[in-house]
Amino acid sequence: MAELTIRPEEIRDALDAFVASYDPGTAAREEVGRVTDAGDGIAHVEGLPSVMANELLRFQDGTLGLAQNLDVRDIGVVVLGDYAGIEEGQEVHRTGEVLSVPVGDNFLGRVVDPLGAPIDGLGPIEAETRRALELQAPSVMQRQEVREPLQTGIKAIDAMIPVGRGQRQLIIGDRQTGKSAIAIDTIINQKANWESGDPKQQVRCIYVAIGQKGSTIAAVRRSLEEAGAMEYTTIVAAPASDPAGFKYLAPYTGSSIGQHWMYGGKHVLIVFDDLSKQAEAYRAVSLLLRRPPGREAYPGDVFYLHSRLLERCAKLSDELGGGSMTGLPFIETKGNDVSAYIPTNVISITDGQIFLQSDLFNANQRPAIDVGISVSRVGGAAQTKAIKGISGTLKLDLAQFRAMEAFAMFASDLDQASRNQLARGARLVELLKQPQYTPFSLEEQVVSIWAGTTGQLDSVEVSDISRFEREFLEYVKRNHAGVMQGIRETKQFSDGAKDELKKAVDAFKPQFSGGSKGSNVPKDVDAGATDADDISQEKITTRKGGATAARG
């Protein structure tokens, strides 16, 4: 028997020759898979041993699919589109590409689906390039701390729970508590920055609608158009009628569009409305792919689903252009329970949360922010000096007011200090109420909150606070425009401005008429009653044939 001799150099040369002649594209063209079963938006395919994770596959009818489960025998594929025409035995071909979406400035003002295709009937979109959906978030060294404010235009948020550029701020609450209203107002408030033309101030907005009714998405678009905000906004829509795969991918599509701008040195605001429905869609996809279920039937990697998405929101270092992407993820709770599985997951990922309480909403406190449980982990670092200087104790004052209010319900006698605290707290609560689609500018917020926290409103009836605020702001704009301009340009609230505003309050109060039917009439104007002879009257007489009117 001949002796077997192993020569390492021959093996090495053979491997080198094979590697040199290997063409990965050849394998992709030659492999043809077959559908073994299909249904509910999922297909299982055999015969594609070289397929990549998240690779796009093309079915026989042209429909695309996303390779998810790479098992030994077959591949679990999420069908991206109508799956009614996919049947057992059909051919499946590789594309050699991972899932990507088109991106660019031409997406501003448009509504697209999770694959980046326009669905607003305004024609095709010319993309600048394509960007993969699954990309690594910026590393620690590629980031910098959040210190630039992103003004929402909502007094309660900008004063007590500030949001900075690059921050992830969770908005959480039951359904119908005003979560979407906060996002829409925040987008509308960026209009002044956009019209300034300064790239350092402009904020491009992305609204990702996941699992909502088509009529709701249309209403959001209409609201943004009426406010002139669609020109700097992109809507990524995955309505309730879409397959679960689309609802699972929609947030990643929005973040890919935003990352293109962020790495270009621009500022982005992205709203995920809402991630609860994305988690439910991912649970449906995972169960159909026969992945083992965990708590509440969610797959074991549901935390990673949201963490790898939200970690893409960041403030980039100056070496990378200093761009930012600010995230406002929404989570819907059941019965105000923030300790459920998905809410606690997202709370642990984000940089703070704004909790909207249904009881406050039903009590006409809108926005219905629960100050006690809401927090921003960035805090004053993301506030302008003007707001920070006047709102330092506002959150504490409101929390103490809520505690005192609950105590006063059972107490028959309160000392004067407690009564004063309750009176001012009630006025602060009324002051922080804000109708939808009426964002406040920085200088308006400063003047309004200064008046409340310094006791200038203590002599105004609670029912008149809203009207007093509105008319006083108009008075200041008309007679003390320099104060407003100084706050707007310097972002600071000087002692001189405070003194001038104090004089303005003292001059305005005598002119202000309280009461629900009052009007702002100066006292030196004679507002006497009109004589009866000067009034044209009508006399009505009734008879059997009907009523006749005779002018007196």
From Swiss-Prot:
Source organism, top-level taxon? Bacteria
| Protein's UniProt keywords contain Cell membrane | yes
The record's subcellular location field reads: Cell membrane
Name the top EC class. Answer: translocase
Which EC numbers does the record give?
A: 7.1.2.2
A molecular function GO annotation: ADP binding
Catalyzed reaction equations = ATP + H2O + 4 H(+)(in) = ADP + phosphate + 5 H(+)(out)
Keyword annotations for this protein? ATP synthesis, ATP-binding, Cell membrane, CF(1), Hydrogen ion transport, Ion transport, Membrane, Nucleotide-binding, Translocase, Transport
What binding partners and quaternary form does the record give?
A: F-type ATPases have 2 components, CF(1) - the catalytic core - and CF(0) - the membrane proton channel. CF(1) has five subunits: alpha(3), beta(3), gamma(1), delta(1), epsilon(1). CF(0) has three main subunits: a(1), b(2) and c(9-12). The alpha and beta chains form an alternating ring which encloses part of the gamma chain. CF(1) is attached to CF(0) by a central stalk formed by the gamma and epsilon chains, while a peripheral stalk is formed by the delta and b chains.
PANTHER family given for it?
ATP SYNTHASE SUBUNIT ALPHA, MITOCHONDRIAL
- Family statement drawn from the similarity comment of this UniProt entry: Belongs to the ATPase alpha/beta chains family.
In UniProt terms, what function does this protein have? Produces ATP from ADP in the presence of a proton gradient across the membrane. The alpha chain is a regulatory subunit.
Kindly provide the name given to this protein in its UniProt entry: ATP synthase subunit alpha
Species this protein is from: Kineococcus radiotolerans (strain ATCC BAA-149 / DSM 14245 / SRS30216)
